[in-house]
Protein backbone atom coordinates (compact mmCIF):
# COMPACT_ATOMS: atom_id res chain seq x y z
CA UNK A 1 0.00 0.00 0.00
CA UNK A 2 1.25 3.47 -0.88
CA UNK A 3 0.09 4.96 2.40
CA UNK A 4 1.63 2.18 4.46
CA UNK A 5 0.44 0.80 7.78
CA UNK A 6 -2.96 -0.04 6.34
CA UNK A 7 -3.61 3.60 5.40
CA UNK A 8 -4.82 4.27 1.87
CA UNK A 9 -3.83 7.53 0.24
CA UNK A 10 -6.54 8.79 -2.10
CA UNK A 11 -6.32 11.52 -4.75
CA UNK A 12 -9.86 12.89 -5.05
CA UNK A 13 -9.65 15.19 -8.09
CA UNK A 14 -7.63 14.35 -11.20
CA UNK A 15 -8.80 15.90 -14.47
CA UNK A 16 -6.62 14.40 -17.19
CA UNK A 17 -5.75 10.92 -18.50
CA UNK A 18 -1.96 11.31 -18.29
CA UNK A 19 -2.31 12.84 -14.85
CA UNK A 20 -4.41 9.83 -13.83
CA UNK A 21 -1.74 7.39 -15.02
CA UNK A 22 0.89 9.17 -12.92
CA UNK A 23 -1.34 9.59 -9.87
CA UNK A 24 -2.09 5.85 -9.92
CA UNK A 25 1.59 5.22 -9.22
CA UNK A 26 1.60 7.47 -6.16
CA UNK A 27 -1.84 6.89 -4.64
CA UNK A 28 -3.81 3.80 -3.67
CA UNK A 29 -6.98 5.16 -5.25
CA UNK A 30 -7.64 7.96 -7.72
CA UNK A 31 -10.89 9.73 -8.59
CA UNK A 32 -11.10 11.22 -12.08
CA UNK A 33 -13.23 14.35 -12.40
CA UNK A 34 -15.09 14.96 -15.65
CA UNK A 35 -15.74 18.65 -16.12
CA UNK A 36 -19.06 20.06 -17.32
CA UNK A 37 -20.09 23.69 -17.70
CA UNK A 38 -23.54 22.92 -19.03
CA UNK A 39 -25.58 19.75 -19.49
CA UNK A 40 -23.95 16.56 -18.21
CA UNK A 41 -23.14 14.04 -20.97
CA UNK A 42 -24.27 10.57 -19.83
CA UNK A 43 -22.27 8.74 -22.48
CA UNK A 44 -19.08 10.59 -21.57
CA UNK A 45 -19.61 9.61 -17.94
CA UNK A 46 -20.20 5.96 -18.81
CA UNK A 47 -17.01 5.84 -20.87
CA UNK A 48 -15.06 7.53 -18.07
CA UNK A 49 -16.34 5.08 -15.47
CA UNK A 50 -15.43 2.16 -17.73
CA UNK A 51 -11.91 3.52 -18.13
CA UNK A 52 -11.16 4.91 -14.67
CA UNK A 53 -13.55 3.27 -12.20
CA UNK A 54 -14.05 6.07 -9.70
CA UNK A 55 -15.49 9.14 -11.40
CA UNK A 56 -16.72 12.52 -10.19
CA UNK A 57 -18.87 15.01 -12.06
CA UNK A 58 -17.16 18.40 -11.81
CA UNK A 59 -19.60 21.27 -12.31
CA UNK A 60 -17.56 24.35 -13.16
CA UNK A 61 -19.29 27.67 -12.51
CA UNK A 62 -22.71 26.04 -12.94
CA UNK A 63 -26.13 27.58 -12.87
CA UNK A 64 -28.26 26.43 -9.91
CA UNK A 65 -30.54 24.55 -12.32
CA UNK A 66 -27.61 22.40 -13.49
CA UNK A 67 -26.70 21.60 -9.88
CA UNK A 68 -30.30 20.61 -9.15
CA UNK A 69 -30.64 18.40 -12.23
CA UNK A 70 -27.28 16.71 -11.69
CA UNK A 71 -27.99 15.86 -8.06
CA UNK A 72 -31.37 14.40 -9.07
CA UNK A 73 -30.13 12.35 -12.03
CA UNK A 74 -26.61 11.21 -11.17
CA UNK A 75 -26.68 9.92 -7.61
CA UNK A 76 -24.24 7.09 -8.42
CA UNK A 77 -21.44 9.56 -9.15
CA UNK A 78 -19.56 11.92 -6.89
CA UNK A 79 -20.61 15.50 -7.62
CA UNK A 80 -18.18 18.38 -7.14
CA UNK A 81 -18.91 22.08 -7.60
CA UNK A 82 -16.21 24.59 -8.42
CA UNK A 83 -17.58 28.13 -8.19
CA UNK A 84 -16.85 31.48 -6.58
CA UNK A 85 -20.51 32.56 -6.69
CA UNK A 86 -21.84 32.47 -3.12
CA UNK A 87 -25.38 31.93 -4.35
CA UNK A 88 -24.29 28.83 -6.28
CA UNK A 89 -22.09 27.61 -3.42
CA UNK A 90 -24.93 27.84 -0.91
CA UNK A 91 -27.44 26.24 -3.29
CA UNK A 92 -25.02 23.39 -4.02
CA UNK A 93 -24.51 22.73 -0.32
CA UNK A 94 -28.27 22.77 0.28
CA UNK A 95 -28.72 20.23 -2.53
CA UNK A 96 -26.12 17.94 -0.96
CA UNK A 97 -23.33 17.77 -3.54
CA UNK A 98 -20.32 15.78 -2.38
CA UNK A 99 -17.80 18.61 -2.35
CA UNK A 100 -17.18 22.29 -2.94
CA UNK A 101 -13.69 22.83 -4.35
CA UNK A 102 -11.62 25.97 -3.72
CA UNK A 103 -14.48 28.50 -3.39
CA UNK A 104 -11.92 31.21 -2.48
CA UNK A 105 -10.43 31.38 -5.98
CA UNK A 106 -11.09 34.77 -7.62
CA UNK A 107 -12.71 36.04 -4.43
CA UNK A 108 -11.62 38.42 -1.68
CA UNK A 109 -12.70 36.03 1.09
CA UNK A 110 -12.67 32.27 1.79
CA UNK A 111 -15.97 31.67 -0.05
CA UNK A 112 -17.52 30.03 3.02
CA UNK A 113 -18.48 31.37 6.44
CA UNK A 114 -19.75 29.97 9.74
CA UNK A 115 -23.28 29.54 8.37
CA UNK A 116 -22.13 27.62 5.30
CA UNK A 117 -19.70 25.51 7.33
CA UNK A 118 -22.53 24.40 9.62
CA UNK A 119 -24.70 23.66 6.59
CA UNK A 120 -21.92 21.58 5.05
CA UNK A 121 -21.82 19.43 8.17
CA UNK A 122 -25.59 19.00 8.11
CA UNK A 123 -25.59 18.02 4.41
CA UNK A 124 -22.37 15.93 4.52
CA UNK A 125 -20.64 18.20 1.99
CA UNK A 126 -16.84 18.21 1.92
CA UNK A 127 -14.49 21.10 1.24
CA UNK A 128 -11.73 20.41 -1.26
CA UNK A 129 -8.43 22.24 -0.71
CA UNK A 130 -6.81 22.29 -4.14
CA UNK A 131 -3.12 22.91 -4.78
CA UNK A 132 -3.55 23.81 -8.45
CA UNK A 133 -4.61 27.48 -8.05
CA UNK A 134 -1.43 28.07 -6.05
CA UNK A 135 0.70 26.73 -8.89
CA UNK A 136 -0.73 29.16 -11.42
CA UNK A 137 -0.78 32.40 -9.43
CA UNK A 138 1.67 35.22 -8.88
CA UNK A 139 3.23 35.79 -5.43
CA UNK A 140 0.59 38.32 -4.39
CA UNK A 141 -2.30 36.09 -5.48
CA UNK A 142 -0.67 33.08 -3.83
CA UNK A 143 -0.37 34.90 -0.51
CA UNK A 144 -4.06 35.81 -0.63
CA UNK A 145 -5.10 32.29 -1.62
CA UNK A 146 -3.16 30.83 1.29
CA UNK A 147 -4.68 33.37 3.68
CA UNK A 148 -8.20 32.41 2.59
CA UNK A 149 -7.37 28.70 2.74
CA UNK A 150 -6.12 29.17 6.31
CA UNK A 151 -9.38 30.90 7.25
CA UNK A 152 -11.41 28.16 5.58
CA UNK A 153 -9.41 25.50 7.42
CA UNK A 154 -10.20 27.14 10.77
CA UNK A 155 -13.92 26.84 9.96
CA UNK A 156 -13.50 23.25 8.80
CA UNK A 157 -11.65 22.35 11.98
CA UNK A 158 -14.09 24.18 14.26
CA UNK A 159 -17.23 22.60 12.81
CA UNK A 160 -15.68 19.26 11.76
CA UNK A 161 -16.50 19.66 8.07
CA UNK A 162 -15.46 16.82 5.79
CA UNK A 163 -12.41 17.76 3.76
CA UNK A 164 -9.75 16.60 1.35
CA UNK A 165 -6.46 17.83 -0.06
CA UNK A 166 -5.99 17.44 -3.81
CA UNK A 167 -3.82 18.52 -6.70
CA UNK A 168 -6.83 18.98 -9.05
CA UNK A 169 -4.31 18.13 -11.77
CA UNK A 170 -5.31 19.06 -15.32
CA UNK A 171 -2.06 17.70 -16.74
CA UNK A 172 0.54 15.28 -15.45
CA UNK A 173 2.90 18.09 -14.42
CA UNK A 174 0.32 19.22 -11.86
CA UNK A 175 0.21 15.87 -10.02
CA UNK A 176 1.90 15.89 -6.62
CA UNK A 177 3.09 13.19 -4.23
CA UNK A 178 0.99 12.48 -1.13
CA UNK A 179 3.71 14.09 0.99
CA UNK A 180 3.35 17.32 -1.01
CA UNK A 181 -0.38 17.44 -0.32
CA UNK A 182 0.31 16.76 3.35
CA UNK A 183 2.77 19.67 3.31
CA UNK A 184 0.05 21.90 1.82
CA UNK A 185 -2.21 20.93 4.70
CA UNK A 186 0.47 21.84 7.22
CA UNK A 187 1.05 25.21 5.53
CA UNK A 188 -2.63 26.16 5.90
CA UNK A 189 -2.69 25.17 9.56
CA UNK A 190 -3.32 21.43 9.80
CA UNK A 191 -1.42 19.17 12.14
CA UNK A 192 0.33 16.35 10.27
CA UNK A 193 -2.26 13.71 11.36
CA UNK A 194 -5.06 16.03 10.18
CA UNK A 195 -3.34 16.51 6.82
CA UNK A 196 -2.86 12.75 6.42
CA UNK A 197 -6.52 12.18 7.25
CA UNK A 198 -7.39 14.65 4.48
CA UNK A 199 -5.92 12.30 1.87
CA UNK A 200 -7.01 9.07 3.54
CA UNK A 201 -9.78 8.85 6.14
CA UNK A 202 -11.99 11.67 4.88
CA UNK A 203 -11.77 10.65 1.20
CA UNK A 204 -12.71 7.11 2.23
CA UNK A 205 -15.78 8.44 4.04
CA UNK A 206 -16.79 10.45 0.96
CA UNK A 207 -16.27 7.48 -1.38
CA UNK A 208 -18.56 5.27 0.69
CA UNK A 209 -21.52 7.10 -0.82
CA UNK A 210 -20.77 5.82 -4.31
CA UNK A 211 -23.24 3.24 -5.56
CA UNK A 212 -21.75 1.31 -8.44
Swiss-Prot record:
The gene is rnp3. Changing residue 176 to A: 45% reconstituted RNase P activity. GO terms for molecular function: ribonuclease P activity. Changing residue 196 to A: 45% reconstituted RNase P activity. One of its GO terms (cellular component) is ribonuclease P complex. Changing residue 180 to A: 50% reconstituted RNase P activity. It comes from Pyrococcus horikoshii (strain ATCC 700860 / DSM 12428 / JCM 9974 / NBRC 100139 / OT-3). Changing residue 114 to A: 75% reconstituted RNase P activity. One of its GO terms (biological process) is tRNA 5'-leader removal. This is Ribonuclease P protein component 3.
Amino acid sequence: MVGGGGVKFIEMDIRDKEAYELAKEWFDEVVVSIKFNEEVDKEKLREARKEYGKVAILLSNPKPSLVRDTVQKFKSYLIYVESNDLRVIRYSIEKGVDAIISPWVNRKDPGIDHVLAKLMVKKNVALGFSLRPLLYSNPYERANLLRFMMKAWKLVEKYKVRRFLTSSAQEKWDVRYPRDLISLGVVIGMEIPQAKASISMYPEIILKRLKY
